[in-house]
Amino acid sequence: MGIQAAEISAILKEQIKNFGQDAQVAEVGRVLSVGDGIARVHGLDNVQAGEMVEFPGGIRGMALNLEVDNVGIVIFGSDRDIKEGDTVKRTNAIVDVPAGEGLLGRVVDGLGNPIDGKGPIVAKERRIADVKAPGIIPRKSVHEPMATGLKSVDAMIPIGRGQRELIIGDRQTGKTAIALDTILNQKSYNDANPGNKLHCFYVAIGQKRSTVAQLVKKLEEAGAMEYTTVVAATASDPAPMQFLAPYSATAMAEYFRDNGMHALIIYDDLSKQAVAYRQMSLLLRRPPGREAYPGDVFYLHSRLLERSAKLNEDFGSGSLTALPVIETQGGDVSAFIPTNVISITDGQIFLETELFYQGIRPAVNTGLSVSRVGSSAQTNSMKSVAGPVKLELAQYREMAAFAQFGSDLDAATQKLLNRGARLTELMKQPQYSPLTNAEIVAVIFAGTNGFLDAVPVKEVGRFEKGLLAYLRSTRKDVLEWLTKEDPKIKGDAEKKLKDAIAEFAKTFA
């Protein structure tokens, strides 16, 4: 049987039609040298600054130094499996991370990969990690309170939604405790008002894994993990991960800001990010400057913190609040990184070792701490009671230093010292016990209106506990009225509050 020519051509045509061209074009380079988490690569002529590249075995890296004859790449992972001569592929993508509600309740690394063993993350979109901050036109001045639940902070150093407030102090002074209490305090507000929810992001930079695990456990126990994402670049992670984590977390939080929602981000702490960046820069042979930090270390933090903002109505009224943490050495706030971050932020909370060891916790130095947003981030009732307490504590500090020299003090000075000692005692607060706005107003009002003057200093804590228990049970109406009405505390409102506290004071013994 002879094969027909037409048949052959039909078969060939069919084969050609179904031929799939599987050839892929990729721009590749070769590793010249590798070590200390840095790879020098030759041949990636068109690579962009900040572009993600891929090494054999799926290890990722980011191109940071674009030089004439080679590219300096930082490696997001172990450099042990990379050797000289390995091929490096361009991905044609800038470093991006997943974003959306699917991240809430999860623990992720600096690239947004889950590390909590709860399966893959369902993300609505991907966002570039390092983007430009919003301009001047979309912004609005800060005017809504972001309550921390801490008496000393909410009354004297108020934080608003969209503000950047630095928490600064030596190691072991309670910086993370303030940040953690702020996250825990949002639970009651989020439950009461789901439409105005505050989504929290906690970035752990260069911390021990055990510390991060403890923190996550605490958040889960308190039911706060449902609105929180933890981004962890721990001490055992490479420096590029510690450098990238804050930017990645900010990109995740910006999803909420840009969609008319509210987010809070805590960077714990930025001193370690600066150290990681210094390490990378020196290994990339960039010229060192003051304290061996590179010349652009100010820009490192300014471009990060400028992304926290309050947007106006035309842009959805969303907000992103930042609480960066900086660790000082021996109380030296005039070092390079602390002064940089102080100048970028809208205020700072100073924590002092001395106060901490005196038992004043949170160890906030109310004289040096400041909020540059001020009372515009406070409710009416809080504004009314915060003014007098600030003044009285300032006078007390001045007089206390003075009173050490003389013993014969006049009655007015003695009264001022007594009141100041009680107010200082009143500002103490145990960890994990945030108070609502109304409760803080009632407690501080009691302190500034003489209800504590006859109470011994040691009994102030017991008085406060008793007063809060009384208001929560017998006089719920007062707390509800303060929350709903938010009155200015004067005239009838002042009388109503005074009467309620006086009722309790009679029973206190």
Swiss-Prot record:
Keyword RNA-binding: no
E.C. designation(s): 7.1.2.2
Keywords annotated in UniProt: ATP synthesis, ATP-binding, CF(1), Hydrogen ion transport, Ion transport, Membrane, Nucleotide-binding, Translocase, Transport
Alphabetized InterPro entries for the sequence: ATP_synth_asu-like_sf (IPR023366), ATP_synth_asu_C (IPR000793), ATP_synth_asu_C_sf (IPR038376), ATP_synth_F1_a_nt-bd_dom (IPR033732), ATP_synth_F1_asu (IPR005294), ATPase_a/bsu_AS (IPR020003), ATPase_F1/V1/A1_a/bsu_N (IPR004100), ATPase_F1/V1/A1_a/bsu_N_sf (IPR036121)
Reaction catalysed by this enzyme: ATP + H2O + 4 H(+)(in) = ADP + phosphate + 5 H(+)(out)
Site (Required for activity) location in chain: 369
Coiled coil: none
UniProt: ATP binding residues: 169-176
Domain of life of the organism encoding this protein: Bacteria
Membrane topology recorded in Swiss-Prot or TrEMBL: Peripheral membrane protein
One Gene Ontology cellular component: plasma membrane-derived chromatophore membrane
Keyword ATP-binding: yes
Molecular function per GO: ADP binding; ATP binding; proton-transporting ATP synthase activity, rotational mechanism
Main location class: membrane
Class of enzymatic activity (EC top level): translocase
Family recorded in the similarity comment: Belongs to the ATPase alpha/beta chains family.
PANTHER family referenced in this protein's UniProt entry, alphabetically: ATP SYNTHASE SUBUNIT ALPHA, MITOCHONDRIAL
Function of the molecule: Produces ATP from ADP in the presence of a proton gradient across the membrane. The alpha chain is a regulatory subunit.
Quaternary assembly: F-type ATPases have 2 components, CF(1) - the catalytic core - and CF(0) - the membrane proton channel. CF(1) has five subunits: alpha(3), beta(3), gamma(1), delta(1), epsilon(1). CF(0) has four main subunits: a(1), b(1), b'(1) and c(9-12).
Protein name: ATP synthase subunit alpha
Gene name of this polypeptide: atpA
